[in-house]
Amino acid sequence: MFYLSTFMTIVISLSLVSCSYDCNNPGFTCHGECHYYGSCICNERLTGYDCSVLKSSLSTGSDCKVTCQNNGRCYDGNKCLCSSDYTGHLCEKQTTGARCTLDGVVFEAYRPIGFDGETYLSQSRSCKLLQSESDVPGMIKFERKIFHGDTSMCGLKKHMDMPNAGDITYEADIYSTFVYNSWGTRDFVDNVKCQYKPTRVGLSMDAPDSLFPIKMSARDGASSNVQATTQSAPISLLFSPQNIPDVKGAMVDYMEVYSINSTSKEYKSVVAVKNGCAQKTEYNVAFDNLDELDPVTSTWIGLVKMQAFIIFENEPLLFNYRLRFCPDRCSKPTCAAPAVSQAPSTAV
């Protein structure tokens, strides 16, 4: 993110955010207003993470005939309104979780109808969860069993005496991407564990940024990790694939630059890269979509060159992007001469 101070210095801070629901992703529904950040904003009559239930239908006490789990809320007397992290009739199933068996861990993922991406263990895209018969209406189910003794690249991480003496914990990081063979800012990572106790429990939680398959950084001519620069100064955005051994190249397929007015909540955005081709914007900022070889990792990393610019005074520039993964250096698309883009989109 580029921050502009009153001294015309642009400060840079880059981060990734993971969430299990984003109404902008294919398959997810929103019966309210889908916010740019991915949350579904309900009107005064609706509730739920996707605004799918009338508040007037919520049931309490003797009016409710079922026991909802995992903080689910009863409605219509016999149904459960789940959070985005759970599904099933009683909210008893995690959208990304595990069943702990005597000889292995069965990873499970429930995705909405319309999901056309991939769900796989972080070790390799070849460790995909495979589609199976779903036991939740309206959801696609993916699963994969990994045996405790598996020594392949899909093998589990094993921890002895964790969290308590005598316990054994197996874990894996599950990547979920909504576009095949790519990674974007609206995709997410879950850390899934099986803790072997007298009763076996599967746990899932958001993974830290260090586990994401992309590391984003910025540099200028003088620094490889630039923290501040002036308006119109040249900036290079670097996108390095990490944690995926069978990926040796990455290139930006789509990148959008946007900013939000913290007072009015208005946002404006411009598309800088589309289908791998740099776009011309009304801010007269030139973008170049390239790649370069990292001599340390022998990996081709995505590289977007641009100039620092302002959308809203004293507000940061933010980035929404999607990268294409390749087993070697990515081929470059054939791009036509860029045309002047339309006025930036706005929303309140």
From Swiss-Prot:
Listed name of the protein: EGF-like domain containing protein 1
- The signal peptide here is 1-19
Which cellular components does GO assign to this protein?
extracellular region
User: How would you summarize where this protein is expressed among tissues?
Assistant: Prismatic layer of shell (at protein level). Expressed primarily in the mantle with highest level in the mantle edge and lower level in the mantle pallium.
Would the keyword Secreted turn up in this protein's UniProt record?
Answer: yes
List localization entries.
Answer: Secreted
Species: Margaritifera margaritifera
Domain spans labelled ZP: 99-342
Per the record, the domain of life is Eukaryota
Q: Does the keyword Disulfide bond apply?
A: yes
